[in-house]
Amino acid sequence: ELLPERALDGDADAVRVLVAEAYEPLLAGGAALLDTLTTYLEQGSSLEATARMLFVHPNTVRYRLRRVTELTGYTPADGRDGFTLWAAIILGRLAARRG
């Protein structure tokens, strides 16, 4: 399915679905979860670099990424899923700014 591509292309229904199934569960999981995922994606999916940036143990990063998968159904280490999660974060933040 091309959900993130459709959402990024401006499909309002796709944006709503992506935000609801990926971004909102991340918000509900807490700031640490969202910060960990964002840092992980920014660091090229490196557990070690993410742990260093967040001043936590790599096992903490692993645990939080498992929680991301449990909450969203997307696996951050998978390239396609990571892209989908990144799109959801961007679109969710934009939607929050618009109110």
What kind of feature is each model-predicted range?
Residues 1-99:
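Cytosolic nucleotide-utilizing catalytic cores of signal-transduction proteins
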